[in-house]
A protein has these predicted regions:
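Terminal catalytic/cofactor-binding subdomain
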Residues: 2-111, 120, 170-195
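Well-ordered alpha/beta subsegment
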Residues: 12, 115-144
Length: 195
């Protein structure tokens, strides 16, 4: 057993039998449009603990949005709503600033809803960093990509079950990671779920 678990294990925030925790509901919404021959930020809405950062990119390069959370990770009952949209003929990349962490839950799931919207002739890259699942984590994540004719999406997610280099494994918990690809009318073109 790690020394810190022996010393502080019973006082960690996820050990709350009989107590209640304040749950977070973070949100980030970003939209890019094509104007004057360039892709530009058109709308931005963010609710704590979610933030969207915009690293400087070389001229002529599509903009980059780094979606991050300042809370350090998700615990049971937390929710995140993320929406990234690129309008017709626009292009953008959305990344994660760092790995997302999902900590042990005392019961409820951590819920993440992601909407990726790609306009006609548009290009979106959705390339967040990995999601690290700690022992006892409970994650319910749903990603819905709505792609217009001629639109293209490059997307990927990576799940890491524990941190082996730190001697941590995910022996139990819950993961539900669902993906859907739809057209603008809402018609389902493809779906897959990892349980």
């Amino acid at each position: 057993m790690k020394w810190w678990k022996a010393m502080y294990g019973d006082t960690l925030p996820s050990n709350t039998e009989g107590g209640s925790l304040r749950r977070m509901h973070g949100a980030a919404r970003v939209m890019f449009t094509h104007r004057d021959g360039q892709s530009r930020l058109a709308e931005l809405d963010q609710r704590t603990p979610m933030r969207v950062l915009f690293p400087k990119v070389p001229a002529g390069t599509p903009p980059v949005a780094a979606v991050t959370t300042v809370s350090g990770g998700l615990v049971g009952g937390d929710t995140q709503d993320i929406e990234v949209s690129v309008g017709d003929r626009a292009a953008a990349t959305a990344i994660g600033q760092a790995a997302e962490k999902v900590y042990r839950s005392n019961g409820p799931d951590s819920n993440v809803e992601i909407a990726l919207n790609v306009g006609e002739g548009a290009w979106l890259e959705w390339l967040p960093q990995e999601t690290i699942l700690f022992d006892g984590a409970r994650l319910n994540r749903r990603t819905v990509a709505t792609i217009s004719p001629g639109g293209r999406l490059l997307a990927g997610e990576c799940l890491v079950f524990g941190r082996l280099a730190s001697g941590e494994t995910m022996a139990h918990g819950k993961v539900r990671d669902a993906w859907e690809v739809r057209d603008p009318t809402g018609r389902l073109n493809w779906a897959d779920t990892l349980l």
